[in-house]
């Protein structure tokens, strides 16, 4: 995999390649979280709430979103659940 970078040092080139891979993985995880939230908002149910809550927790544990944002998002979903 070739990454276009200005780096000349071998370790910097490797880090640039890793950054691209990590960005793709993180973007996919965040997208899955957003999709789960949107699915719940479209049709609020206990099952979809659990799925959305789980995906929010996973994103927070991996450092994709702040812990406080995760708590806030889950609380907002819980109020929509009723």
Swiss-Prot record:
One Gene Ontology CC term in the entry: cytosol
GO molecular function: small ribosomal subunit rRNA binding; structural constituent of ribosome
Domain of life: Bacteria
UniProtKB keywords: Ribonucleoprotein, Ribosomal protein, RNA-binding, rRNA-binding
Claim: DNA-binding is one of the keywords in the record: no
InterPro entries for this protein: Ribosomal_bS20 (IPR002583), Ribosomal_bS20_sf (IPR036510)
A Pfam family matched in the record: Ribosomal_S20p
Keyword hit for rRNA-binding: yes
Gene3D superfamilies to which the protein is assigned, alphabetical: Ribosomal protein S20
GO biological process, one term: translation
Function: Binds directly to 16S ribosomal RNA.
HAMAP family: Ribosomal_bS20
Similarity comment: family membership: Belongs to the bacterial ribosomal protein bS20 family.
Protein name: Small ribosomal subunit protein bS20
Species in which this protein is naturally found: Streptococcus agalactiae serotype V (strain ATCC BAA-611 / 2603 V/R)
Name of the coding gene: rpsT
């Amino acid at each position: 995999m070739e990454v276009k970078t200005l780096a000349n040092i071998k370790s910097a080139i490797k880090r640039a390649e890793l950054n691209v891979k990590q960005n793709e993985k993180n973007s996919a995880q965040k997208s899955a979280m957003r999709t789960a939230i949107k699915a719940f908002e479209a049709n609020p149910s206990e099952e979809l709430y659990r799925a959305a809550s789980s995906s929010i927790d996973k994103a927070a544990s991996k450092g994709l979103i702040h812990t406080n944002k995760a708590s806030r998002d889950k609380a907002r979903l819980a109020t929509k659940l009723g």
